[in-house]
Regions:
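Alpha/beta-hydrolase-fold catalytic nucleophile elbow
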Residues: 406
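Anionic-ligand binding patches
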Residues: 198, 403
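Intrinsically disordered, low-complexity basic segments at termini and long loops, enriched
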Residues: 1-36
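Short, thiol/selenol-centered motifs that function as redox-active sites or metal-ligating centers
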Residues: 179-183, 384-387
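Extended, subdomain-level signal for the structured scaffold at the beginning of enzyme domains
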Residues: 29-30, 34-172, 184-195, 205-216, ...
Length: 465
């Protein structure tokens, strides 16, 4: 049967047309009128991507703006992008932005504002930057994009070198962006949203300066400024940046293979067969394998969401080192090497996808033996993207099971009867399709382990619904 993981919220729309701003009663801030007012010149984003049952195909990326950046949109040359990070940065927002912009061909520099390249992002995720912000001061960029998270946003705000760089960039007409807390905490504090329409994380809306028109759109574009709400809107945000840099055709091209959600902000579902109760005697213990070449977004989304739900997640590297380089060159630091992590017992073992990451998993005898032991014990296991086909199917771990995988890998599955579903649960197995389904995959796991209300709570907290 088809089981709705999250209910539909009628008030949330893919197209959010906002009316003319009006003053609040106390005169402290301009806010936009209700979404129902259709006669608006407001620039905002509509990103409906639809999955074709046979081949992933993205619908058109529609972006309206108060003013265009035609020079940036028309140039085919590689664009240079700076993404600063700090301790406490929201990892989904940082990594999703970097991943998608690199898919578009941008030269993205992840720069630490800390003293070291390694930053301890939120939810226990450890990232390694490409350089220090202090070493980027003489460089010019086509885009500077600020991830959110706290205290990461406050640290970005307090970095004098970064402030000088961004202000100079904006004064020179550069494209700039921020998501989550960063529009209010960083750009607002620096006076870079004055007179503009902007959005941010819901609990920070009141922290936007009075001279900013606060919008509740998932992604807001006003001239050269692009803002967004949170981790659950990060993919939409990043694709808006691709369109601003390279144009609509490139944004559509990048979106197609990612298996995007049909309607952003609304319900999602999983196909569940042979329903089984997923329960743990204590806090669920989850093993997430990583290797060089795993898919950046998938890996980070799974870890982040499950830790938000209060599961204990161990990130284990099957490589000889803790640090791995993901498929889009994000550098992540695992919690343990495989040999140490494998000494523990787990309720659930998960594999992100990506290439050559899935191939590395498939060739790891120690990982395959652990998975087979897990399956034989009737414990829970799962995989996303290329891994269901390249790892689980290849090693007999889908025998008698219904599953899905990345659409280009469907033909490798012996049973393709459920492949069109974005998330499939069959007893103790869960599989999913790709980067654009990873949030749904993680939230489906949250519901199976913790219940529907917890899944709703986590989904709302990241502005996924």
């Amino acid at each position: 049967k088809t089981h709705d993981v999250l209910p539909q919220f009628e008030s949330q729309r893919d197209i959010n047309i906002v009316g003319t701003p009006h003053p609040r009663r106390d005169g402290s801030r301009r806010r936009a009128a209700a979404p129902e007012m259709a006669n608006s010149t407001l620039a905002l984003l509509h990103l409906p991507f639809f999955l074709n049952p046979i081949r992933p195909r993205a619908a058109a990326l529609h972006l309206r703006r108060r003013s265009t950046i035609s020079a940036m949109a028309s140039s085919p040359l590689q664009k240079k992008v700076l993404v600063p990070v700090a301790n406490g940065t929201e990892p989904m927002e940082a990594v999703t932005t970097v991943d998608i912009l690199r898919r578009a061909g941008a030269d993205v520099t992840v720069a630490s504002v800390e003293e070291n390249l390694r930053v301890d992002a939120s939810w226990g995720l450890k990232l390694v930057a490409d350089s220090l912000v202090s070493d980027c001061g003489g460089d010019s960029f086509d885009l500077i994009s600020l991830p959110g998270g706290m205290p990461g946003s406050a640290t970005l705000r307090d970095c004098a070198i970064l402030e000088e760089m961004v202000k100079k960039h904006v004064s020179n007409g550069g494209l700039y962006a921020a998501i989550c807390a960063a529009p209010a905490v960083v750009l607002g504090s620096w006076g870079l949203l004055k007179g503009l329409r902007a959005t941010c994380y819901p609990s920070f809306m009141e922290k936007l300066p009075p001279d900013v028109t606060a919008e509740e759109s998932r992604v807001q574009v006003d001239g050269r400024a692009v803002t967004s709400r949170g981790a659950g809107t990060a993919m939409e945000f990043a694709l808006a940046l691709v369109e601003q840099l390279y144009g609509k055709d490139k944004a559509d091209e990048v979106a197609k293979p990612m298996v995007m959600r049909p309607r952003h902000g609304e319900e999602f579902s999983m196909e569940e067969l042979n329903s089984a109760e997923w329960k743990s005697n204590n806090i669920p213990q989850i093993f997430v394998a990583v290797a060089n070449g795993v898919e950046d977004m998938e890996t980070v989304m799974i870890i982040d969401i499950l830790r938000r739900a209060k599961a204990t997640v161990v990130v284990a590297s099957i490589e000889d080192e803790l640090e791995i380089v993901a498929s889009k060159k994000t550098k992540l630091v695992a919690d343990m090497l495989f040999e140490e992590a494998a000494k523990l017992e787990y309720d659930l073992i998960l594999l992100p996808g990506g290439l050559p990451g899935a191939q590395n998993f498939a060739e790891s005898e120690k990982l395959i033996n652990l998975l087979k032991k897990q399956a034989e014990s009737k414990k829970f296991y799962g995989a996303v993207c290329a891994s269901p086909a390249m790892v689980l199917e290849r090693h007999g771990l889908l025998k008698g099971k219904k599953a899905t995988a990345y659409p280009a890998r469907w033909s490798a599955l012996s049973d393709q009867s459920e492949v069109q579903n974005r998330v499939v649960v069959d007893g103790n197995l869960i599989t999913s399709q790709g980067p654009g389904t990873s949030m749904e995959f993680a939230l489906a796991i949250v519901e199976k382990l913790f219940g529907r209300e917890k899944a709703l709570e986590v989904a709302k907290s990241v502005v996924f619904i």
